[in-house]
Amino acid sequence: MAKRSVLGLGLGLGLSLVLGCASSPPLDLELAEVPSAEELYRQGNQHLEGRRRFLLFHSTDYSKAIESFQDVIDNYPYSEYAVLSELKIADAYFDQDLYEEALTYYRDFADLHPDHEQVAYTIYRAALCHYRQSHGPGRDQTATEQAIAQLDRLISKYPQSPQAAEGEAMWRELRTRLAEHAMGIGDFYMDREEYQSAADRYRSVLDAYPGLGLDAEALYKLGLCYSEMNRDDEAARIFQVLLENYEGSDVAREARDLVPAAN
């Protein structure tokens, strides 16, 4: 009787397995079919274009757009659509003012695809990310310096690109900001009668940021620092350079009274 019980149990289990297999769909039918790279890319663009609302306004679903583009990258990493999707994700973050996220994608694109035709664009946009996070002359200038570093790279490596032409104006603006920042620190030391520290800052403006419109002022204040430190010969030489090169400036007229030979 014990043998019949074991045999009956075995037959019962075998029958259950057969019935279970018969009632379960094949594994490949359970897996959802992944759309093509082109279709996923098209879906991402549709989410970016958004839907018209209230006649004039469009609602853009950046999250779904990024998800679609990421699906392209995950499922078709070697397709051209994957490369384009990297750019689309970067731009989607940028358009939401999420500059750190955008910056990561722009920098990675330039590093991973150094020969791609859009590299100049990504370097320029990386500079823009830093630019949008930068501050005026009176505050920390780390982002300003990072933006300039990207623009230096853009202008030196891709001088004929449209982005280089656009970047030159930004480059000049940012360098002027750094010069103004240095001048502000010089003024800070000057007000506290720390003339050597002030002179070092004014000198740095002349050495590092010439031709940005601050040369005359920097020369004048450098001369004043030397005068206050009783380095009269150096002060006279600086004032003379000021008079010879910026004769019509307001500070040159003030310096004229401080140079006996010029009167």
Predicted regions and their residues:
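Acidic, polar-rich low-complexity tracts and alpha-helical solenoid repeat scaffolds
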Residues: 2, 20-263
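Bacterial N-terminal signal peptides
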Residues: 8-18
